[in-house]
Amino acid sequence: MSCCGCCGGCGSSCCKPVCCCVPVCSCSSCGGCKGGCSSCGGCGSCGGCKGGCGSCGGCGSCGGCKGGCGSCGGCGSCGGCKGGCGSCGGCGSCGGCKGGCGSCGGCGSCGGCKGGCSSCGGCGSCGAASPSCVSPAAASPAVQALLLPVQLLQALLLPAQLLLVQLLLSLLLLHDCGSSCCPMSCSLPIYCQREI
């Protein structure tokens, strides 16, 4: 069976029925689509690797999508690794999403690791989201709604606490000084002069 008879992109030894009919794309061997594609849409159906990359090197090897994509959307559905990264290195290897994302949304659904991190290193490894990505500014609205009444209560109780401390201090000074001096002029017990 001939391959790419319309454009001659693949060599005569290639026996795949589906070929990319653009001269800039070529298949190096029959068993796997290797090398990057500049503007032909990437590897169409080579080992399950779908989705093309603009100028980032394409898919490294069929069955294992390696290397990052600049701005082409990354690897579509290569081994469960979904979602592309702008300029953070993309998905390290299909089946194990490694490396952090700057501001592109992180790893979509790679082994349970969901949500992106802005500058904390992204998702370290699939199956465990990095705990350092949680920040107080990124708290959920429900948590913020629960914290607001507590903060208001603390603000209201602060003057009452100060007044109570001042009252207790005055009572202590009055007890120590006796009737020889009033609490206003008797600041410390050492200055009190008791009548003999």
Curated annotation (Swiss-Prot):
Sequence repeats lie at residues 14-17, 20-23. One of its GO terms (cellular component) is intermediate filament. Belongs to the KRTAP type 5 family. Interacts with hair keratins. This is Keratin-associated protein 5-3. Keywords: Keratin, Repeat. The gene is Krtap5-3. In the hair cortex, hair keratin intermediate filaments are embedded in an interfilamentous matrix, consisting of hair keratin-associated protein (KRTAP), which are essential for the formation of a rigid and resistant hair shaft through their extensive disulfide bond cross-linking with abundant cysteine residues of hair keratins. The matrix proteins include the high-sulfur and high-glycine-tyrosine keratins.
